[in-house]
């Protein structure tokens, strides 16, 4: 099969981090990124392992058309004068094309683990004080369009004794507040889970690398399997509306054979677990470069199909499909690049719920929402309504329902009551639906400036800058 050039872009030299020209090309249904530095030679890496899926995602992304508004000037502190160019002048700079969907604040550099796969290389340093963090929260709350939510990260945020205070402060300014955690402190105390939920926490973003000891021993340096299960159980017992998203770092040969089991575990615990967000390993921070460890989003989607009886790779859409939900309660369109993330929803219902401390009944086999809903038709209608600044209606949803619908119509009317514009209504959706997603953060080897310019996950920094996730972790962190 002949080599086909897909598009040309810019990337980074992994050695000197200078911007260099790059191209994506297809060979035998695999897409590669190839680039050459005048000083350090040629580099090549796998970009996407399924060219057909690449084209499907590209078409579905164009269908939504949600990345049109350029929003960097509205950040309040744009880098309007180019010095070194993208991605070195982040602030956001005037070249950035997508609004902040999720804003991240690193509230500590300390950590109670030394994970071999930590992209942040966390473990030392001092914490910013509470007033510095609150000032960042205030600045982020003034971005326009306003971010959909905020995440406290690090390091390990639960090492801060004032985390509940920070959660409460953020909740007064943002509907959605989440904490990125390894779960060690959650496993120690159900009361701690209750304290953070009472303060206003929306969801714990829980590091969760697989089923059984082995993935944790390899990726985290110790067996944390019982810790993860206890963290989930403590939140189940303590929470009025418990919410956890499982976040597996996926490494080839370590836990890529457990993707199906992780999804099944999430579905079986859907009274607490609201989603799974697989993150193919990013080869930066403490993670050493080894091309044999590389996993791409298509690898995750095909594994989900091969390892479950209910999912197909084509059930997934670009992460921009989340705009259907987020914009309904006033958040910005999710304008990320179609190669950045994939998402699907499983219908799990809520019949397995029995309240705090009660037994959970056996749950029926999950079903992808695409079995019952023509998501592409709904997305086309959404894009038209967005362009006309109109709200999506229940009728718009019903027009997209497939004739084979076996679900109660009350479920659909409840699940897609998007016109309410209330965060709690959309949040309640995740008591009946389980999000299954994949988000692949870049490293210096597969870095693509076209993706960076459409990034929607941004760090808020004490100096006032707002920096795209992959630019921050590859270039700006520690500078």
List the model feature ranges, each with a label.
Residues 134-151, 160-280:
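Radical SAM/AdoMet-radical enzyme domain recognition
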